[in-house]
Amino acid sequence: MSFQHRQIEKKWQDYWEDNKTFKTDTFSNKEKFYALDMFPYPSGQGLHVGHPEGYTATDILARMKRMQGYEVMHPMGWDAFGLPAEQYAIDTGNSPAEFTNQNINTFKRQIKELGFSYDWDREINTTDPNYYKWTQWIFKKLYENDLAYMDEVAVNWCPALGTVLANEEVIDGKSERGGHPVIRKPMKQWMLKITAYADRLLEDLNELDWPDSLKEMQRNWIGRSEGAEVTFSIKGNEGTFTVFTTRPDTLFGATYAVVAPEHPLVKEITTLSQKEAVQNYLDEIQTKSDLERTDLAKDKTGVFTGAYAINPVNGEEMPIWVADYVLMSYGTGAIMAVPAHDERDYEFANTFGLPIKEVVAGGNIDDEAYTGDGEHVNSEFLNGLGKEEAITKMIDWLEANGSGEKKITYRLRDWLFARQRYWGEPIPIIHWEDGTMTAVPDEDLPLTLPQVAEIKPSGTGESPLANNTDWVNVVDPETGLKGRRETNTMPQWAGSCWYFLRYIDPNNTERLADPKALEEWLPIDIYIGGAEHAVLHLLYARFWHKFLFDIGVVSTKEPFQKLYNQGMILGEGNEKMSKSKGNVVNPDDIIDSHGADTLRLYEMFMGPLDASVAWSTNGLDGSRRFLDRVWRLYVGDDGSLTDKIIDDESTELDKIYHETVKKVTDDFEHMHFNTGISQMMVFINECYKANKIPKIYAEGFVKLLSPVAPHLSEEIWQKLGHSESISKATWPAYDESKLVEDEVEVVLQIMGKVRSKIQVPVDISKDDLEKAALDDESMQKWLEGKTIRKVIVVPGKLVNIVAN
């Protein structure tokens, strides 16, 4: 008989909600365990089967830890600001807030139907003014500590749409919507000085229990480089420019310089004869993204400015070019080109007929750039030296001659913290007519978004908020000074930088969260989510956390002690699930046909949690069959317990039961859920073979199953005679003495060749083992007509007989 999943699941979901079964006591005396999911963006599509994979993993840990006596924090909320809701509002004329709330309701229903043990009293929503009041407060603190500033930054400007576009909205230089031309245009933007934390973000990675691959991605993103900054003067011009290089030892081989098209020097140094060519080039590359500009495979383009730099080390003139492969946002926006020893410079020099001078021996520069190590040549005081020695000597020379200095630089850029959008947190800053800026006072937070009838582009590059003059224009009541509110809003990353702190104290109106509560619960014990957030979200959250640590809000340097990335669930043919391929699996359908417990079990059993695995309907059916077998083992056709479960002590399942408790506990702790479930299946097979199942083992098994299949387990637990939820029960313990084998298999050999195997007691003596080997029927056949010369006995392993 199959269990009725629809009735059982609804019954227990209602029970948990009515009884607040999973409510967390913030100041409990128990040991704390904080299990966190990456909260979702509530899209219009609803939940997909990828979401429950990570959520089930944290839920298993949360449920097990509760039963092990921990106070567990396991919350859920909504990362609800974002572009899709604004786009929907522009397209339909409806409110993004209403659209977002509808989506949240769908997500919440779906998540509740999966039976996750969330404390819904801690639910947060990043678009709730009571929440973003504190996002604004953190921004204010960053501003007060000189970590938020305004700067001119090139953005993707679409004149036809009258708006700034995010990188992901631009495809091949055109807007994703409508295919209009997009150009790069400098605009004043808010920046956060994440670079001030670069070293700490790098060093503290060593203290975290994170996957090595993920730590490496963050290290590469921060990209610490040691080298030198070199200053070049310009022939016939007062100006200078600096370049950063990791190879100052190759300065004698620098034969030309390249500056980014956006470099302020370009206008200053371009000669009259080159002005037109330079302007044409600047117009031509306006539509290219940074990614296109730095593509190694693309043909090199550039134009000569007509100006020359002076190489400080040998006084030689170097032509200054403008080329799009140099970015203003990286380094100083200018490079010294050493074409003999850099592939990109070599290609550029060959394209434009620029000189190539060897300064490191070992290659053939007529054929290609030599990027290996070797002795320095054509380098005066560096000749004959190796790389490291030459770098040190050149830096000493640069510093002694006032031409440069040792420098550490980072690939990490400051964080562009502004979006020209309506649907985001308003930035709490006022720009006054006298050119000053002030932050909105704390007592006026939250600065809420104004209600608008429709969202339309401002046409000026400002956000749609600029259209709302009543909201934008302000007057200082004390001085009469006129001002304008900041019209940019925060990026979607803002709310997710600190949401895990608010869960700890979600209704506090006086402060971000109670410091004592934060101290109780931080750092987070386990954070599970997709690897696509490896860099941005996790780096930004670490940056904000370190800042909050510095100003005394939190007491830990890092927010997430242990982090785990779940893999991706692919379509049946090993392809990514997508609507266009028609291979998307909707969890609602599975919950209806197979049940939430089956979906949870299957997603944990389909493979290792961190692997990408293809969805299989057969696998799903197999998971349901296993749960049906469990049900039939416990529950008869009349709905009562089967006769197989007895109160007596029977020993036939001793070993397999204690093995199962040990393996499931260990595997769940280490997030090897698939092998833990596999062991449960082995146990159920043994139960079917056994004559009787002691009730204590029957109960122990249901406890082990309950984190994976909670609804079914609650129902069986009730049938076993319990009135309280199984989540209040104690996690089973195993007895080491029951795991010990009382018998062992011994290999029997003649002249080193295996001829038989026997089972013997573990504590058998050497003499008895020798006798048992000689008495074995198979051995007697092999020994017939032979003389035994020697018997070698290795207790617990083998007996080898030398005979001829």
UniProtKB/Swiss-Prot annotation:
Domain of life per record: Bacteria
Annotated ATP binding sites: K579
Coiled coil (UniProt feature): none
Keyword Cell membrane applies: no
Gene Ontology biological process: leucyl-tRNA aminoacylation
GO (cellular component) term, any one: cytosol
Subcellular location: Cytoplasm
Motif extent ('KMSKS' region): 576-580
Enzyme Commission code(s) on record: 6.1.1.4
Pfam families: Anticodon_1, tRNA-synt_1, tRNA-synt_1_2, tRNA-synt_1g
Chief location: cytoplasm
Span(s) of short sequence motif 'HIGH' region: 40-51
Catalytic activity: tRNA(Leu) + L-leucine + ATP = L-leucyl-tRNA(Leu) + AMP + diphosphate
Swiss-Prot/TrEMBL keywords: Aminoacyl-tRNA synthetase, ATP-binding, Cytoplasm, Ligase, Nucleotide-binding, Protein biosynthesis
Name of this chain's protein: Leucine--tRNA ligase
Organism: Oceanobacillus iheyensis (strain DSM 14371 / CIP 107618 / JCM 11309 / KCTC 3954 / HTE831)
This protein's encoding gene: leuS
